Structures are given as C-alpha cells and as structure tokens.
Amino acid sequence: MPNHYRISKTVDGTKTYQLWDNDRVVSEFDSELNMKINYRIGTNGQVLSDSKENLYSYDGHGNLVNGKDNSSTTVYDVYGNKTEDIGIGDAPFGYCGEYTDSESGFVYLRNRYYDPSTGSFITEDPIKDGNNWYGYCAGNPVNGWDPSGLFGENT
C-alpha cells in the first residue's frame, strides 16, 4: 500500500518539516532544521508523550482523550468533531490518534485529508473504489476507520 507522507507544511510563511516512522510523525523541525518537538511512540503506534513533557491517553477508538496530567479531556463525536475540549490545547494527535492540522481542522491520513465537519474526504479516492469517492468509512465511523485515506478498516 503506498503512503504519501507529507514532509513539510507552510502556514503563514512559516515552514515546518516532519519526520515520519511507521505511519507516525516522530519529530517536527523549523525551517532551519532545529527540532521543535519530538514524539515518543508506543508499541501500539500511538503517541505516548512528547519532548514538552505532555503525556497522552486514548479511548477504545484511538481518539486522544487526555493530556499532560489527565486533568484535561477531549470528547469527539463519531465523525471526529470535538464536542468537548478541556485543556489538551494544540496536541496534534486527536481523532483516531491521527495528525490533525490545527489551521484547517483536517485530519491528515497520508494519502488524503479528512474533514470531520463534513464527514468526508476533501479529495476523491485515488483508487476510485465504490460509489462515493469522498466517503469516509462507508458512512460508518462507529465500526471503522481509514488510517491511510485509501480504504476503511473495521475497528
């Protein structure tokens, strides 16, 4: 399965580089390649902590639910919209533990971006499988997820 890892992004003229390992961002660097943050990945592939001393925990669907000292809470609806956010702030790993761009709210799934506000991808399926090339998890995110942006999987 191909993966199209994004190696950098530019927001308001500021470039950030990303280093990936096993489908996870493990480090981010500024435009001069100074490390901004480093993430520690657990054996299950989820981000456990970062170099800023934040600790993360997840629910059964892989959604980030607690930050730093477990006094913060985030709750998502089935499509990935935050319904409650107390204290996690700008942690980039949210819905299904996937990298979420704070600027757009889009979830980066390696091959496509997912928009929780519409429950669909913002570009058509590059494989062009099925009838709805923008659909996320065949409209059933309770029982599935799509970590690659190419095809849904049962959770």
Where are these regions (language model features)?
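Aromatic-rich beta-strand edge motifs centered on tyrosine
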Residues: M1-Y5, K15-R24, K36-G45, N54-G62, ...
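Acidic glycine-/aspartate-rich tracts in secreted/extracellular proteins
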Residues: G13, D129, N140-V142
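A motif-centric feature for acidic-aromatic and gly/ser/thr-rich catalytic loops and repeats
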Residues: K52-R110, Y134, A138-F151
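Beta-strand elements of repeat-based all-beta scaffolds
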Residues: Y5-T10, R24-D30, Q46-S49, N63-K68, ...
